[in-house]
């Protein structure tokens, strides 16, 4: 029997120390990784609840275990809320991650060897959309589409490839593409060749909810997303689908890929979805988009090239070649200045994937902590200051001091 009054700090000082160090890092550092955000205390409290103790294989009202009456309520709330958020016919809130949600789509609609048309990872796609080392690339025949000379999705080439290869499934969505995607045109192409049309909005979901990015639900057969990133919920996944695909998708998740769902995480998803239904969340997403525009404009003023020349979302790719620094080196230097970003390949990148010629920058996290246009402009200039002299310790120290002055004015949890 454990002692009920013993908390983490007494039970495991080593883990507690790491948690506290991470808490300090999140408070002091400026977070610009586009896929990261700060979940609310309410979301984290739900995830830390007693629901973690409950096994609940199956779906609400159709469980293989007894005692599921309370988790049924929670899961149904999550389903109903996410359907309302996106205007979807049906939803599955059980995927443990965005990648598992994506795997479920493949399991529901395809057989090994079927052809998929997806965005090239090298030009902004995601590894679950056909990267050779990923399950999607190992099990299926992958045909990739990419960008044109303007670094925009080449819809004409995409259409030609669809007609030539007759894919069973076409994927829209990206992990490093800053522009709006024409989901309606994708849908027309998919319909012409008889393909299932799947959209992955893991990055854009929060913006979609607020009307700041196109909603693919009216056009797609199935839509997947993570629940963290711009949705600002717990780490996990969701699947939205047309009514006729609900049985296939649900069977692909359980028993196809997963057993008992993580009901404590589903509770946190439900809380996050309720938050996302508020006017405050819409205003937050509007500010995310405004901040991204300011960030990109400021970097351009400082002599940096933005891939595609602009952003129409929360994210941007920055080409560092003119500065003579790799993405890997930039990530390290910015980290020393307490600005967190990730290295990222750019289209036709001459560097290896673990080195890269670019960085990816996003505004969801800084907007959550309260940054508006003024603070965003300051942050973009601080980032540019580091890139001007990445090996100058005095420069890094000066930027770090300015970062701390800024973050102390906008605490996350304190």
Curated annotation (Swiss-Prot):
Its cofactor is pyridoxal 5'-phosphate. Pathway: One-carbon metabolism; tetrahydrofolate interconversion; Amino-acid biosynthesis; glycine biosynthesis; glycine from L-serine: step 1/1. Its EC number is 2.1.2.1. One of its GO terms (molecular function) is glycine hydroxymethyltransferase activity. It is found in: Cytoplasm. The modification N6-(pyridoxal phosphate)lysine is found at residue 229. Transmembrane segments: none annotated. (6S)-5,6,7,8-tetrahydrofolate binds at residues 121, 125-127. The keyword Ligase does not apply. Catalyzes the reversible interconversion of serine and glycine with tetrahydrofolate (THF) serving as the one-carbon carrier. This reaction serves as the major source of one-carbon groups required for the biosynthesis of purines, thymidylate, methionine, and other important biomolecules. Also exhibits THF-independent aldolase activity toward beta-hydroxyamino acids, producing glycine and aldehydes, via a retro-aldol mechanism. Homodimer. HAMAP family: SHMT. This is Serine hydroxymethyltransferase. It comes from Paracidovorax citrulli (strain AAC00-1). The gene is glyA.
């Amino acid at each position: 029997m454990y002692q009920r009054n013993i908390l983490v700090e007494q039970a495991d000082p080593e883990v507690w120390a790491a948690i506290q160090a991470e808490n300090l890092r999140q408070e002091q550092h400026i977070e610009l990784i586009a896929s990261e955000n700060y979940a609310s205390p309410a979301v984290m409290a739900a995830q830390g609840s007693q629901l973690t103790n409950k096994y609940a294989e199956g779906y609400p009202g159709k469980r293989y275990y007894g005692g599921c009456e309370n988790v049924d309520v929670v899961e149904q709330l999550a389903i109903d809320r996410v359907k309302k958020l996106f205007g979807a016919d049906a939803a599955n809130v059980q995927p443990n991650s965005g990648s598992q949600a994506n795997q479920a789509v493949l399991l529901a609609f395809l057989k090994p060897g079927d052809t998929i048309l997806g965005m090239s990872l090298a030009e902004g796609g995601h590894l679950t959309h056909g990267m050779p080392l990923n399950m999607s690339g190992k099990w299926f025949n992958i045909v990739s589409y990419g960008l044109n000379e303007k670094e925009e999705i080449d819809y004409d080439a995409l259409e030609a490839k669809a007609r030539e290869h007759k894919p069973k499934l076409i994927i829209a969505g990206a992990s490093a593409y800053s522009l709006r995607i024409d989901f309606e045109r994708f849908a027309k192409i998919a319909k012409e060749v008889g393909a299932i049309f799947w959209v992955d909005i893991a990055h854009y979901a929060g913006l979609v909810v607020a009307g700041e990015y196109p909603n693919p639900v009216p056009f797609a057969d199935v839509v997947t997303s993570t629940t963290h990133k711009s949705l600002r919920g717990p780490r996990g996944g969701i699947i939205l689908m047309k009514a006729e695909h609900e049985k296939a998708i649900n069977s692909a998740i359980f028993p196809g890929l997963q057993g008992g769902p993580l009901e404590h995480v589903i509770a946190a998803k439900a809380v996050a979805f309720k938050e996302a239904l508020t006017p405050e969340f819409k205003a937050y997403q509007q500010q995310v988009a405004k901040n991204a525009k300011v960030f990109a404009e400021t970097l351009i003023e400082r002599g940096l090239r933005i891939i595609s020349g602009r952003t129409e979302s929360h994210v941007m790719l920055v080409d560092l070649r003119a500065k003579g620094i790799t993405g890997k080196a930039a990530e390290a230097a910015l980290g020393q200045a307490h600005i967190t970003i990730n290295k990222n390949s750019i289209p036709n990148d001459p560097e290896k994937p673990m080195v890269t010629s670019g960085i990816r920058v996003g505004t969801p996290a800084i907007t959550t902590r309260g940054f508006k246009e003024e603070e965003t402009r300051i942050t973009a200039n601080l980032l540019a200051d580091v890139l001007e002299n990445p090996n100058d310790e005095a420069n890094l120290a000066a930027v770090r001091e300015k970062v701390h002055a800024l973050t102390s004015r906008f605490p996350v949890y304190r």
